[in-house]
């Protein structure tokens, strides 16, 4: 794992500042726009279904409404498109770093657009769906932590916890999904860099990950835990700083 981490750093250090800047700009622009789109879509679907808000009683009927299905389809399409473009941009950045090229965030974005165009010409429509599934598995802890804070998802998860059979089934399904995804983790490399079609990219990924599955899984798990710990630390520090600022300005106001 140490060698894999070192090799990865050797590749990205050529452009790590621009990769970080690209991620900050890309996520900073696309995330608020996408969240607003999803929020408006849900409000429109609620209005069309005749509801003011979601409850455990009306969520079933709400989900089968045609407008709801259309809103979810649009949100899924836009989300997959945003995710695919980001992935293509990062592949461009790593590919450029391997050839010792300095790439600006604009070059990374343009390279991502070019790779997206190539995938469309090859009709690799399975690749964006694969990327979405991979993204959901990797970010599942963050997604669940966000969803359970809102109604009626919190009620649904509370009821789900009371069903051990359902929980066991979901855990088995998750483990199966992760194990199935590991041998296919380098499919993007085969499609976007080696210019293969999706099925050939999957085969190429199997070849490259052969006898390295557990090493790749351990490396991915290590960095996932590192990101979670870093995000938690940043959150705690932010809360502490905010609390100190509130106390300070409150005392200043009282003193006046």
Question: Which role does the model predict for each range below?
Answer:
Residues 1-256:
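Hydrophobic alpha-helical membrane segments
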